[in-house]
Amino acid sequence: MRLWLILILALASLCGDAVAQNVAIADATVYPSQGAPLQTHTTILIHAGKIAAIGSNLPIPSGVRVLPCDGCIVFAGFWNTHVHFAGRQWDNSDRAPADQLSRDMQSMLTHSGFTTVVDLASDPINTTASRRRVESGEVAGPRIYTAGFGLYPPHGIPFYLDDLPATLRARLPQPATPAAAVEAVQQNQALGTDVVKLFTGAYLTPNNITHIPLDIARAAVSEGHRHSQLVFAHPSDLQGVRIAVDSGVDVLAHAPDTVGGVDDALVKEMVARHMAMIPTLKLFSGSGHIDRIREIVLQFHTAGGRLLFGTDTGYLTDYDVTEEYRQLELAGLSFRDVLSMLTSNPAAEFNVSSHAGSVRLGGDGDLTILSADPAVGDLRNFAHVLYAIRAGRVIFEAPPQH
């Protein structure tokens, strides 16, 4: 408590704009981390982007913005590890009006509580421009990791990208040799990308999948790892998963949706290779194989695999993520399982657990605040977002209910 009081006094001694950026959440119910006990009637103070104090009956310095809470539910900031800044609203992100970009971020991402997102294929020029403006404080948005352009099989652009403008489509890498794959990864990196995305299995038509040759996939993975970048793969089917496993991919960007041959032995091999998986079950909810896809996700989890939350938002133009929570519950995952997917698991995957993925003193001031507790009743309560706070800045605030 003495340390907290020192920090509070330090907050109180500040003046001007710095105080205006400090935030307090009072009388909250807090889930500090996936396995930690619930804390009730708790106050959290954020200063300079970090959690400066946590406790009961803490005095709140004057000048600090206090968010109305009344028993609201507080978590570490949610991650969405599969999004795409792919719509026309992201064109010319370097010069689009800041208030419009903030509204677009809210519409697609922050209204669902996401304080960190991973973009798994978009035009890197636009996405890095958006990220730059978010980081400067000009635009209210989440922390953004980006893959830039995904790498496709030779002559392997998926059919669902047929409507892309010809100029953009011509820029999509389809490396035909290992050297070309290395060059494509390097070109992305030169534009400021953070991760690598491979389409190890790509749908040329709804019933025809083509694949990246293994030597090309291995070259891309090796180049990504040489720069300490995680490598994600869109697998599609058994062969796409097999290439991802054998090339050293870190994360499956989807559960496989053409499920033939994907058996328990392969799932256990993925876990043994320390691969993670993003289920994206809403994407497949209309599939005739959805029951089996959910089974694969649960098998992976039960075998000890790390699941990450992601929705393919941006490719999916319906930005409501409620169905993803419903599908995860139907798959047999618990509240604590899904909370890990949203917080501690992605923080661990991105090697930032020392300061992200939990609510703790000195940690990042990234919080997602809900109006209803998903531990009680329905996992869809994860979508009932009151506030999203990123580094102490409120980047989403739900409109008042009358």
Indicate residue ranges for each PLM-predicted region:
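Histidine-rich, glycine-flanked metal-binding segment
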Residues: Q34-F75
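Alpha-helical scaffold segments that flank or form the walls of functional sites
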Residues: N92-A140, L172-D194
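Divalent metal-dependent hydrolysis catalytic cores, especially in the metallo-beta-lactamase
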Residues: D104-T128, G141-F149, T193-Y203, L230, ...
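Histidine/acidic-residue-rich, glycine-tolerant segments that coordinate divalent metal ions
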Residues: S136-I243, T258-G261
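Active-site core of metal-dependent hydrolases
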Residues: L198-F199, Y203-R294, A303, L308, ...
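His/Asp/Glu-enriched, well-ordered alpha-helical/loop segment
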Residues: R292-P374
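C-terminal cap of metal-dependent C-N hydrolases
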Residues: A348, L361-H402
